[in-house]
Structure formats: structure tokens, C-alpha cells
Amino acid sequence: TFTHYSNASYNQTILQKDAHISMGVENTYDLALNGSPYLIGAITTYGDSTNNSLNIKAGSSVEFFTFLPKKDKNGNNTFDERITHLVGGLAYQGNVKNNKIFIKDANMIIHGPSKAYASLAAAHISAGYIDSESDKNFQASKNLLDIDSFNLDMYMNHDKQPLAYNSVLFADFLGGKTEQGQALDNTINIKRY
């Protein structure tokens, strides 16, 4: 769901068993990502996002792609801001409240480059998220990230499955996040990891 100059409330995105989401480009070692891959319960610009949810059910899978490291103004490596985002409710210039992400026995798959035995990816996982470019404060409150186990795996483009491989997911796990304002009474509930 997307709204502009209005509120987004009580929307759901549900990944059922065997659903597979693949967002990104094949060769991010040589080619920068083009746009930001988002999987969201609801997004609004200039409004509030409340009571929305992203539900990633058992047996479903989300594929994360590798990313190019970028340099900040001090010359340090930093994540490409166009990494994969999983968000329950997102607002640009608005408040987020009572949004949720549920992850239960889902598959998080790192997409390895051709012939690779190791790969890494970055992600931003937040039940409620506010992006703001003004002096006004916005509030992220009572959002819930609920994790009941997920399986980390790697997709490999090989003729034969190797005996061993490495997959690493660098992620920010957040109940609620605001670029400017207050984050109050947000929860991360981890049952199994």
C-alpha cells in the first residue's frame, strides 16, 4: 500500500509458504544497485503509517544481494544505502505507530556471485521507520519486530554443491527508527534465532 499526503493504516504484506522474493541485481561486485529494494507492509509520504504489518511466514524466502562498499567523506567503508529494506510501516515526513514485522522459520538467502563460495549482504529490518528531511520531529512508537527463527543460507551458481560455504548477513534489526524525533516503546522480540 502506498499513500501520498494521507495516512496508511491496517495494511498487510504476507509471504506465504513457498513464496520467494528476490530483489537486486546479479552482479553487484561490478555494478552498483539501481534503486532500493523494499519489502513493506505500507508506505506513506506526508502522512502517518499505523497498524501495518509485514509477515514472512514459515517456508517463504527472501533473497539478499551483495553490495558494493562505498567510501564516506572520511574515506571509511560504508554500506550502500540502497541495500534491502524490510519494513512493517514506513513514513516519509510522518509518524509510525503499532507497525509490526513477523518472521517465523523463514529462509534468508544471500545471493552469491557466480562461482563464489562465500558472500555477504546488508539489510535494514525495522518494524517502523521514519525518513525525514525537515526540522520537524516525528515519533516512532509501539512498533514490534518479532523473530521466531530464520534460516540463513546462500544461493550459489555452481555445477556441484560445495562441501562448505559462508554466508554473512549484516543487518540492523530495529523495533522503530526515526531520522529526527523520538523512538518510544518499540520492541524486538526474539524467540529463537
Summary of predicted features, one role per range:
Residues 1-85, 89-193:
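Surface-exposed loop/turn motifs in large extracellular/passenger domains
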